[in-house]
């Protein structure tokens, strides 16, 4: 059974989720809402993308709706989530990708329009967070609003799970070397809450904060309080990389750690965690659907208890694929797929 999905917010993640759904046979996008663009512009932005190339399919406009691959997709321009008539489109699951309605109270407004569940494509202060390959099996159908966490947490958590399961993490620090995003500046500009964040993204390496490492403690309770981290925003348009440095309780050589990660990548975490020994660079990961691609050649160890691990992620494409995977999983648990 195909799960019918609506998207609120047709920005980077909203559009990349749509593109991924085109390759995701058990999910169908039936409606999109964005109050800041009209249908012809939405069609244009879906069709052409500077990072991921042209859309693989026909995109046209019929009246006020999109037609994608011959199928009509209702298009709305409501500012209030409660006013979006999801029920008339058949959309049961809503991807909340505006970056604005990230709390349970705000996101549940979609339920008034007939939606059954809301999946926030961002970290949430109070909604339950699920990371595919890590804790999605704890979902029991009770939450009306859930979060897919962040792209960085989706990269970090599967790797941290493998290391903790096999060797027990005592404590660790994470740095994500992260491509610039839409919230940053093309030229220096005002940013009262984050002065460094107001500097031009194209010329600077910008230290920034991230809650991604601490969020791992929410999806892997055993690691709560054991990890924290920061971000370095760099002048690349897409693809990021996690540097995880940990102390482990059970001594292991770097070769043993590589073996454990490869076993997980080829087994229970296949499709979420990948493993490579190639001499890759960031652009090689553009469009990679995995949450986390472990770079076996990039990591180092000081001794058998102190190690630095490196894992890549396409912070747009891989994350958006997990949003859809989470929806598919949730729908099956709910009995709607």
Curated annotation (Swiss-Prot):
Main localization (coarse): cytoplasm
Enumerate the GO terms in the molecular function aspect. glyceraldehyde-3-phosphate dehydrogenase (NAD+) (phosphorylating) activity; NAD binding; NADP binding
EC annotation from Swiss-Prot or TrEMBL: 1.2.1.12
Tell me which residues this entry annotates as catalytic: 151
According to its UniProt record, which reaction does this protein catalyse?
D-glyceraldehyde 3-phosphate + phosphate + NAD(+) = (2R)-3-phospho-glyceroyl phosphate + NADH + H(+)
Which Pfam families does the record associate with it?
A: Gp_dh_C (PF02800), Gp_dh_N (PF00044)
Query: Which amino acid positions bind NAD(+), per UniProt?
Result: 12-13, 34, 79, 315
Q: What pathway does this protein act in? A: Carbohydrate degradation; glycolysis; pyruvate from D-glyceraldehyde 3-phosphate: step 1/5
Q: Which UniProt keywords apply?
A: Cytoplasm, Glycolysis, NAD, Oxidoreductase
One GO BP annotation of this record: glucose metabolic process
| Matching PROSITE patterns | GAPDH (PS00071)
**Which residue positions does UniProt flag as site: Activates thiol group during catalysis?**
178
Sites where the protein binds D-glyceraldehyde 3-phosphate:
150-152, 181, 210-211, 233
**What GO cellular-component annotations does this UniProt entry give?**
cytosol
Binding partners and assembly? Homotetramer.
The record ties this protein, via NCBIfam families, to: GAPDH-I
Family, per entry: Belongs to the glyceraldehyde-3-phosphate dehydrogenase family.
Which PANTHER family does this entry report, sorted A to Z?
Answer: GLYCERALDEHYDE 3-PHOSPHATE DEHYDROGENASE, GLYCERALDEHYDE-3-PHOSPHATE DEHYDROGENASE-RELATED
What protein name is recorded for this chain?
A: Glyceraldehyde-3-phosphate dehydrogenase
| Organism listed in the record | Cryphonectria parasitica
């Amino acid at each position: 059974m195909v799960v019918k999905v609506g998207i609120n917010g047709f920005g980077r993640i909203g559009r990349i989720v749509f593109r991924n759904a085109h390759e995701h046979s058990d999910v169908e996008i039936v409606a999109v809402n964005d109050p800041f663009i009209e249908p012809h512009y939405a069609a244009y932005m879906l069709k052409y993308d500077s990072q991921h190339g042209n859309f693989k399919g026909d995109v046209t406009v019929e009246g006020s709706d999109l037609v994608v691959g011959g199928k009509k997709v209702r298009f709305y321009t409501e500012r209030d989530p409660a006013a979006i008539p999801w029920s008339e489109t058949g959309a049961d699951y809503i991807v909340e990708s505006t970056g604005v309605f990230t709390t349970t109270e705000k996101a549940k407004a979609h339920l008034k329009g007939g939606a059954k569940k809301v999946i926030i494509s961002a970290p949430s202060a109070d909604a339950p967070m699920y990371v595919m390959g890590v804790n999605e099996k704890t979902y029991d159908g009770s939450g009306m609003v859930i979060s897919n966490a962040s792209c960085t947490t989706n990269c970090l958590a599967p790797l941290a799970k493998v290391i903790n399961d096999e060797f027990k993490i005592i404590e660790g620090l994470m740095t994500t070397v992260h491509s610039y995003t839409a919230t940053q500046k093309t030229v220096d500009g005002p940013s009262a809450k984050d002065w460094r964040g107001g500097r031009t993204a194209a010329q600077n390496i910008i230290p920034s904060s991230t809650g991604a490492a601490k969020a791992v403690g929410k999806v892997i309770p055993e690691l709560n309080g054991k990890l924290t981290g920061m971000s370095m925003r760099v002048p690349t348009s897409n693809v990021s990389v996690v540097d995880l440095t940990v102390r482990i309780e059970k001594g292991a050589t770097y070769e043993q750690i590589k073996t454990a990660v490869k076993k997980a990548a080829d087994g229970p975490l296949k499709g979420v965690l990948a493993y490579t020994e190639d001499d890759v660079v960031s652009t090689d990961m553009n469009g990679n659907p995995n949450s986390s691609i472990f770079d076996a050649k990039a990591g180092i160890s000081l001794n058998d208890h102190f190690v630095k691990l490196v894992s890549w992620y396409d912070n747009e494409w891989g994350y958006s694929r997990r949003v859809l995977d989470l929806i598919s999983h949730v729908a099956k648990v709910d009995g709607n797929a």
